[in-house]
Regions:
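A generic structural signal for short coil/turn motifs at secondary-structure boundaries
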Residues: 49, 73, 142-143
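All-alpha amphipathic helical-bundle segments outside canonical DNA-binding/catalytic cores
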Residues: 122, 138-152
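Amphipathic, well-ordered alpha-helical segments in soluble domains
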Residues: 36-39, 126-133, 152
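Glycine-/small-residue-rich active-site loops that bind phosphorylated ligands and cofactors
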Residues: 54, 77, 141
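Short hydrophobic-aromatic micro-motifs
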Residues: 62-65, 85
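A hydrophobic/aromatic-rich effector-binding and dimerization subdomain
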Residues: 2-15, 73-138
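Generic protein-terminus/edge-of-domain signal
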Residues: 1-61, 68, 100-104, 111-115
Length: 154
């Protein structure tokens, strides 16, 4: 069995990054000990997750469950822009009840054998507005800002 490198770290319940890279180095297969959601904005990217290949389109949502072996290949002829959310499994589990489960999207992705969601007109959706507000909340250092971010995320 091949050995894969664990990459990234998470020292909070969740973290959001908005990144744009003009040039991205090739990344070997790896895994994380947290869940990851990537909202692809622009670029030319192929994601390999657990042996399945996805050529991304703008505003695709990529779901990578903790422990999933994955890598991406980026065509550096154009900028690669995305929003990434790292989520602690403990955070997801803390909000699980009989009536709802925050990890449902990851479970459904596994069941349907597809780690990519395509939402028509994503930039017009309420999800897009919510993500934009959540992203903006990370610039606010006011009273209880971390709690505010958690509430927005939920």
């Amino acid at each position: 069995m091949e050995q894969y490198e664990k990459k990234g770290y998470l020292n909070s319940e969740f973290r959001l990054f908005h990144l744009t890279d003009q040039e991205t180095k090739e990344v070997d297969y790896h895994y994380h000990d947290f869940d990851k959601i990537t909202i692809f904005i622009r670029g030319k990217v192929n994601y390999m997750i657990e042996g399945r290949s996805y050529d991304l389109k703008p505003y695709d949502i990529v779901l990578v469950k903790q422990g999933d072996i994955h890598r991406l290949t980026v065509d550096n002829s154009c900028p690669y822009e995305r929003i990434i959310v790292y989520i602690s499994p403990n955070f997801m589990n803390a909000y699980q009840t009989d009536t709802y489960d925050l990890s449902y999207c990851f479970q459904k992705a596994a069941k349907e054998h597809s780690n990519v969601l395509r939402i028509p007109s994503f930039e017009k959706s309420s999800l897009f507005r919510s993500i934009s507000q959540l992203e903006h909340s990370f610039t606010d250092g006011g009273y209880a800002s971390e709690l505010y971010r958690q509430v927005m995320f939920l």
